[in-house]
Amino acid sequence: MNWMDIRIGQGYDVHALVEGRKLILGGVEIPHTRGLLGHSDADALLHAITDALFGAAGLGDIGRHFPDTDPAFAGADSRVLLREAVRRVREAGYDVGNVDATVIAQKPKLAPHVPGMVANLAADLGIAPGRCNVKAKTNEKLGFEGREDGIVAQAAVLIYRAEAAEQD
């Protein structure tokens, strides 16, 4: 395997917290008084990971593949979009190595929900749970996250050329 067979991608997403929406992160519905505003289910964590996957494979970004102007994606389950992104990355000749993600939210406390998020990620990415990491952070009451106006997610993924791994 040479260095061109391994690629990394970085993803970012942010959504506003609003009344009347469910809060879904990592495919887990989290009890809270507000949820994330968006065209789909607004799962910022899965959107950041999806974006990172597309970027790593040189396939653009989430908006290119699942535009928020397309009614077909209104209310879409982001787990379905993530699985489709994985399919497209594999079609381009890559497999997922690992993912490391951070969710930044002042409230609610996310740590109790991280195991469910990791289980969903492992299932959707087709990798072992030990290759999926999710960290929950606050912003120490600073910025829009600290004011509880929104939630941010950041992700890094590693992908590798599938046939190169088979040759080793």
Swiss-Prot record:
The record marks H39, T138 as: Transition state stabilizer. It is an enzyme of class 4 (lyase). Gene3D superfamilies: 2-C-methyl-D-erythritol 2,4-cyclodiphosphate synthase. A divalent metal cation binds at D13, H15, H47. It catalyses: 4-CDP-2-C-methyl-D-erythritol 2-phosphate = 2-C-methyl-D-erythritol 2,4-cyclic diphosphate + CMP. Homotrimer. NCBIfam families: ispF (TIGR00151). Belongs to the IspF family. Involved in the biosynthesis of isopentenyl diphosphate (IPP) and dimethylallyl diphosphate (DMAPP), two major building blocks of isoprenoid compounds. Catalyzes the conversion of 4-diphosphocytidyl-2-C-methyl-D-erythritol 2-phosphate (CDP-ME2P) to 2-C-methyl-D-erythritol 2,4-cyclodiphosphate (ME-CPP) with a corresponding release of cytidine 5-monophosphate (CMP). This is 2-C-methyl-D-erythritol 2,4-cyclodiphosphate synthase. The lineage of its organism: Bacteria, Pseudomonadati, Pseudomonadota, Betaproteobacteria, Burkholderiales.
